């Protein structure tokens, strides 16, 4: 994984992970988590197709890897953009946020509202 000297406000990986071999998946996610406690993420799902896609996976696959790193998934973007045809379909389908559990608890406390970040 990439080790940085500090954390950033946001780590972003949009439609990149599917281009890396499955053997690199956990290392890649670890690098994103090393960069920030909040990760904006999307990756091609199985059957999406595309040039150079070698590791298309359902979202649950990525969610399990992030959960090993103690990152919760927040699905707060897709409902807002689902019907916006100006946004490419693969973003509308695949984009989510992962947040480190302690950051989530600090920002949201007992508030279950996903928009508390």
Q: What are the residue ranges of the model-derived segments?
A:
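Short, surface-exposed amphipathic charged segments that create phosphate/polyanion-binding patches used
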Residues: 9, 56, 86-96
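Short catalytic/ligand-binding loop motif for oxyanion handling, primarily in non-cytosolic enzymes
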Residues: 3, 20, 47-52, 82-86, ...
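Short alpha-helix
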Residues: 54-76
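Conserved SAM-binding loop
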Residues: 1-48, 59-63, 98-100
């Amino acid at each position: 994984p990439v080790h940085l000297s500090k954390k950033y406000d946001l780590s972003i990986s949009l439609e990149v992970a599917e281009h890396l071999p499955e053997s690199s998946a956990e290392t890649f996610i670890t690098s994103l988590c090393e960069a920030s406690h909040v990760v904006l993420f999307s990756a091609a799902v199985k059957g999406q197709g595309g040039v150079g896609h070698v590791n298309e996976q359902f979202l649950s696959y990525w969610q399990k890897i992030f959960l090993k790193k103690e990152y919760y998934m927040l699905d707060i973007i897709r409902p807002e953009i689902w019907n916006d045809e100006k946004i490419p379909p693969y973003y509308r389908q695949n984009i989510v946020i992962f947040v480190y559990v302690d950051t989530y608890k600090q920002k949201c406390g007992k508030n279950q509202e996903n928009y508390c970040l």
